[in-house]
């Protein structure tokens, strides 16, 4: 073969690489959706180096922002050894601008709530962060809002009461333009949670309320505790009768579902109890055998 033929052969082999050189890039399994994705569709977290597909991570972040109330967004891997936390720069790159602004606002509100030297003005329309003077733990101090000049207690958020305890204090004194929104009136649109005293606004809907701050469930009209009222019997009698805000049919359907769940759990317990009784001797024997083996292993007289 001449030199021209050898050059043509080398050019052909260079332009047509072997099949091994065209092997596809390795796929990585996402721990959230369990789908295999290429590396360009994955995102690695900076703090813990865990890797997930970008689409799943975006959905996870948006859900964490809506449900997390400003708490840090942790790695979605439940068995992450480094317990990684997502940085703000990562969140800003993966969620829309409005979602990131919501996260920053909720985060700031949470920081103020946990800071003993800052608190929110209890007037709903004010939303001013007020400085709290240092004091002994649990000792109430006078706080004055720099915007609306409301003077209130740092502990119970009621009007400042210098000579009485928080439980015996009078209702909070609000500016005239806000008094129609607050108070003990059953139809008032804004009330305080009976447990944590956070202000809650109700526009419409169900009268069974759950405080987002402390998870306490109560009746909006009389503020009675409903944590253990799974059948909603509170709205069958008394001053709150038929004030739940749902039709009678929906209430009966809810009670039917609760009864069905309880009956199902009872049936499962009845079915599994004989099996547990039959298997209990075997379980006890295995436990005793294991204990004897450990005792012999650590007994110095046997060595």
UniProtKB/Swiss-Prot annotation:
Gene label: RNF144B
Binding site for Zn(2+) 2: 121, 126, 145, 148
UniProt: Zn(2+) 1 binding residues: 30, 33, 53, 56
GO molecular function: ubiquitin conjugating enzyme binding; ubiquitin protein ligase activity; ubiquitin-protein transferase activity; zinc ion binding
Membrane topology field: Single-pass membrane protein
Protein name from the UniProt record: E3 ubiquitin-protein ligase RNF144B
Annotated coiled-coil segments of the chain: none
Xref: Pfam families: IBR, IBR_1
Secretion signal span: none
Residues engaged in binding Zn(2+) 4: 193, 196, 211, 214
Protein family per UniProt: Belongs to the RBR family. RNF144 subfamily.
Alphabetical GO biological process terms: apoptotic process; negative regulation of apoptotic process; protein ubiquitination; ubiquitin-dependent protein catabolic process
Organism annotation: Homo sapiens
Alphabetized InterPro entries for the sequence: E3_UB_ligase_RBR, IBR_dom, TRIAD_supradom, Znf_RING, Znf_RING/FYVE/PHD, Znf_RING_CS
